[in-house]
Amino acid sequence: MSLFKGKTLMITGGTGSFGNAVLNRFLKTDIGEIRIFSRDEKKQDDMRHDFQARMPEVADKIKFYIGDVRDLQSVRGAMPGVDYIFHAAALKQVPSCEFFPMEAVRTNVIGTENVLTAAIEEGVESVICLSTDKAAYPINAMGITKAIEEKVAVAKSRMSGKTKICCTRYGNVMCSRGSVIPLWIDQIKQGNPITLTEPSMTRFIMSLEEAVDLVLFAFENGENGDLLIQKAPACTIQTQAEAVCELFGGKKEDIKVIGIRHGEKM
């Protein structure tokens, strides 16, 4: 972690699963400060209390900033003194983005442009933008906006001065907030059949730790304008569901197929 010694890292959308994973890994290192930039004060308060309870000796390294990536002025307000940025703020639920596509544009596209504009103005050293495999040959609003986010990052990298801008592209991050595995676990605990959309649907999968590793790899090895994609194992949703049943005592015969959601890929 010597590259982070005494440095200030800002994580946009930092109260999510990725932000928590970064804090768990970084707080006990020699990093100077981690800024959590997000719009939900309740999630910030929950995170503050959680880390004060679990890591009281280093919790004061976390600084919380209320703001929204859609608002350039609020992004600028959190930027002074920042050395590095992990840009994780996004709308990522496929059906939500499908029903409200302009909301996805405002967060995933305009929000990214705002973060990069403010970072370049402030002379931030490095920005890593988190994207998704759904940006490849996109068929839904979420994938389309994340593909444009990548284009925005590449375009900004051509005029970024000393600021290095890279993107990483993820598969499905297991057990992240809003993903299907926590839903299945809750359904099993409640004694209900687990629901899946389409058994033959295939997804690339990775753990939260692998997600953090990919961002760190991009941070350490990426060149300005790069898009880094990790090779990841793939499996069907049926296989995932059966594995969760085995681990948590669910019944495979109770798996209930509910059909593909709006905008989903096979």
Where are the regions a protein language model picked out?
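Conserved residues in the N-terminal Rossmann fold of short-chain dehydrogenase/reductase
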Residues: 38, 65-66, 106, 198, ...
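Conserved beta-loop-beta element that borders a ligand/cofactor-binding pocket
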Residues: 126, 152-202, 226-227, 253-258
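N-terminal Rossmann NAD(P)H-binding glycine-rich loop of SDR-like oxidoreductase domains
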Residues: 7-29
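Conserved glycine-rich Rossmann-like NAD(P)H-binding loop of the short-chain dehydrogenase/reductase
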Residues: 30-46
